[in-house]
Amino acid sequence: MVSKKEENILSETRRFNEIDLWQNVTEEQWNDAGWQLKNAIRSVEQLKKVIKLSPNQASEIERTLKTLKSEGKEALRITPYYATLMQEDPFHPVMLPGEKAEKRLDPVFWQSVPTPANLLFPDTGAEGAMSEGSRSYGAAYQRYPNRIALFVAENTSCASYCVHCQRAKSLDGSVDVNSTEIDRGLFYIGHNSNINEVLVTGGDALMISRHRLQYILEELGRIPHLRVIRIATRVPVVMPMGITDELLGLIRTSANRFSKGVEKHVYFMTHINHYKEVTNDLAAAVKRISDHGFTVRNQTVLLNHVNDNYKTLAETFRRMFWIGVHPYYLLQCHKEKGIVHFITPIQIGKIYMKHLQGWLSGITVPRYAANIEGGGGKVLLMPSGHDTLNINTKIDEKISESYATVITWDGRELVSYEALGRSTREEFEAGVKIMDDFIGRKGAFLPKLIIVDEKGKHIETTNRTRLPALENLRKSQLLGYKLYADDMPLTNPKDALSELEEGFEKSKYFKG
């Protein structure tokens, strides 16, 4: 018999035929990826039939969408499946104990639905801060010696759009990824013998035609020095019915049809940000992937308002691992225009990582890193338990500055690197009021921004009056561990010897 705890590791979706928009939809239609794409939520009118929105909330979302569209951005697309992960009232979510639900909105809502927050603080992040163009040849983009990204799909190809995406969803034709660009990228990968790993990405690598996917994988398979093919996709998370045996068979066959010797190692990289996304449907999709011999790794983005919480991160990492997804990276949110309200101070991320170490299985604790603008690549932000330089200075005891010196993988030193966005006090206070009015209460919109004066000089960082308090008892409670002596989980059987002996003698294992 499955225990109650095991039954509860997967989040439940809402029943689609109990939602106004899909009352007459059949199971067959619902489980068809083509139907999901055709019926994606693209308007506020559709959204109102799925979640509760006040007239003001609906109006403000509509205003946001129109403004973004006028800037050339296609901002709203949610698959029906992913929409069922949103609670009916996203402004008053039910959450786990310790997650401070009164200060939160539904995490899938935050990730999927543009709000007035996306129009605030326009001068705090650059448009296209993570642009690939300056380091590209055709569809290939490189910033490391041995690996490369091959962009095979437009930004607008994704099944569902992520509000926090580092790449703006453009409506103009300049984002087209045509066959010539792909061929130029394939040529470069074959030309540069240092490259042994390629990231096939987009947009979403699994949202292109089967014909194009087969062609790309077969051509990559012909390159002798290429050893690893990584496929970047969020389809398992936002549209798991799109992960079919037919698709997986095509990937396995195509990647090695023309390879010689040892087969190319193919694996998937996906994007889970919250345990609410770890559902039975996702678990089934991951099992199909693993049954075809592929592994799945994950990159989570640390997002203020979504998963900026010790309990939330712990549940997200361990639940995804329990269904077969390896938590690979926890990434700092990019300082991109329109999404700076999602940024969490790096110090907070380091504190979470410090206190996850040892309390979760090592393989479930990802590497914390920031992707540096301008082709700097990833810089690790992991805290260390080995202190030789900062004697008696602990990361979780004093609020640090909001900037630091970072050193990239190739030895470049960036002085005063800032992870947070900037704002004047007037702009910040006006923005908070707009969002308080939109949400309907205070305290749920807490952007972390650097407040500057008229000369750009740092005054303070907002919403940083305290650091997470994570003593052992608190961590034990948040992680749901049974407590023994000293308010700690049992880590030595000898500490509970009498209880164990008594229980063993009553168990089926006792032979007398």
Predicted regions and their residues:
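Conserved Radical SAM active-site core
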Residues: 113, 121-151, 163-263
